[in-house]
Amino acid sequence: MNHQKYIRNFSIIAHIDHGKSTLADRLIEHCGGLQAREMSQQVLDSMDIEKERGITIKAQTVRLVYKAKDGNNYYLNLMDTPGHVDFAYEVSRSLAACEGSLLVVDSTQGVEAQTLANVYQAIENDHEIVLVLNKLDLPASEPEQVKQQIEDIIGIDTSEAVLISAKSGIGIDLVLEAIVNKLPPPKESSSDILKALLVDSWYDPYLGVVILVRVIDGYLRKNMRIKMMATNSVYTVENVGYFTPKKHISDVLHAGEIGFFTAAIKQVADCKVGDTITDEKKPCEQALPGFKPNLPVVFCGLYPTDSSEFEHLKDSLAKLRLNDASFEYEMESSSALGVGFRCGFLGLLHLEIIQERLSREFDLDLITTAPSVVYKIHMRDGENLEIHNPADLPDLQKIESMEEPWIKATIMVPDEFLGAVLSLCTEKRGMQLDHSYIANRAKIIYKLPLNEIVYDFYDRLKSCSKGYASFEWQMDVYEPSELVKLGILVNAEVVDALSTIVHRSRAEQRGRALCVRLKDLIPRQQIDIAIQASIGSRIIARETIKALRKDVLSKCYGGDISRKRKLLEKQKAGKKRMRQYGNIEIPQSAFIAALKIGDE
């Protein structure tokens, strides 16, 4: 392997749909990573969902060999990163493994909210940034205006920006030359003792866990005994290699390189992302600074529509967990829905993708309960609790105070839609922190409660701005709030699966909306059915499903009135008994429709 000065480790960062994965395809094609017949669109997006939705979920890596104009061969390690806010953690891991970044901006759309978030992360990691303006072939492309926008908002020098069209392949050689000439090589190795950063891990059915590493010092070779510093686990390396993007086995990974190894590790949970890997015999003294753990922020219950599918759901979740350590689940039961799982996600897109993968890859039909967030409860007896399931909320008399999570949201929107976006944020209990204009776009920063975001905020933001607004958020603080548990009763029976924790000011509106929706969904019976929304013992909304009238006199043609009276009295007694003991069956379809996110 050549000297470190011929290695370049870089990641591609951009907002969704600005052309990251297409640019990665062109770079692979240009450097001969795959033959023309093996190329497909979005080579690095391996999941079907990634290709269909046009998003990157898992960060992917590939090593390219490029012969530069100076006559030398350079080894380029490319990390393709996700652009969606839910997967910002994947971005932070990729950035920590690299020295430079390609910032891709769509020259027809300009700077978006997620572009900003990723750029600031790259700057925090001391990255050298090469600006790439994409989609130059489109008639709406305005490179000069976008350059000015970038200088105004981010403050990066745009005089050496590379203008390309990733789709048609224009300017790809300029990007490669910029990578070689402007991005720095890895720092010289300061020691021969192995020190490597664990960047990612995933499960392979034949090899066990495959671990992606960035070697900082020393080298990693086959049959070495290595130690994970966070867990002190010791393993023997079985295979070492890199991706081109095909898997390529080699003998050794040197300092500065990015590659993978396998070591007969059974579970992804044993490999903590951000951990330091070192030699068991000669361990390094100090571990690398890792990443802050990625904690789930949105929770919901997943239940099989058929209880016989429970074991299949359990196995399916375990398989998904092998490749997605940020996804958490635990068993729970509900009187209405049976046995299922309480699951934790990074955000709503993450929730949707897990749901879609369960139905598509494992053929499961699921009911999803209303999403909730983690609340902090301070009890009168001094105990502090963290809950995310409304069923776990203690009696309000025992609670001293409750805190809910708030987020800091950055929204970029064309100024003609600003009014609609501001009124949406105000409706969601938002507080405006900042408001500025860049050309004809407004950048607003709001503080918003997370439990208002998880319902339908993103969908409504897109619809009130005709799809032009972009949105990025990060957790901010927990603040005291007047929260209540909104319960739904059907025929005086509490339906636990429909319970939610809401702000007192929104309780009546949401309770009424749920009652109205259930009235349309639950089939009529022979008795009146009361659907009620309650806070504790107080009813705040009610709808009634009127009874079906069964005509018991239809077979009485004339005859004695006492005969008719006897039949009517019998029906009356039956209805009384039904009201007393009858359970109202709520069909699964009613649950699914009532719990639909975004139909508020």
Curated annotation (Swiss-Prot):
GO BP, sorted A to Z: positive regulation of translation
Main location: membrane
GO MF annotations, alphabetized: GTP binding; GTPase activity; guanosine tetraphosphate binding; ribosome binding; translation elongation factor activity
Catalytic reaction list: GTP + H2O = GDP + phosphate + H(+)
Listed GO CC annotations: plasma membrane
tr-type G domain ranges (all copies): 5-187
Keyword GTP-binding carried by entry: yes
Enzyme Commission number, as recorded: 3.6.5.n1
Cysteine disulfide links: none
Entries under CDD domains matching the protein: EF4_II, EF4_III, LepA, lepA_C
Residues engaged in binding GTP: 17-22, 134-137
Key word Ribonucleoprotein present: no
Topology relative to the membrane: Peripheral membrane protein
Compartments in which it is found: Cell inner membrane
Function recorded in the entry: Required for accurate and efficient protein synthesis under certain stress conditions. May act as a fidelity factor of the translation reaction, by catalyzing a one-codon backward translocation of tRNAs on improperly translocated ribosomes. Back-translocation proceeds from a post-translocation (POST) complex to a pre-translocation (PRE) complex, thus giving elongation factor G a second chance to translocate the tRNAs correctly. Binds to ribosomes in a GTP-dependent manner.
Protein name (Swiss-Prot/TrEMBL): Elongation factor 4
Species the sequence originates in: Rickettsia conorii (strain ATCC VR-613 / Malish 7)
Gene: lepA
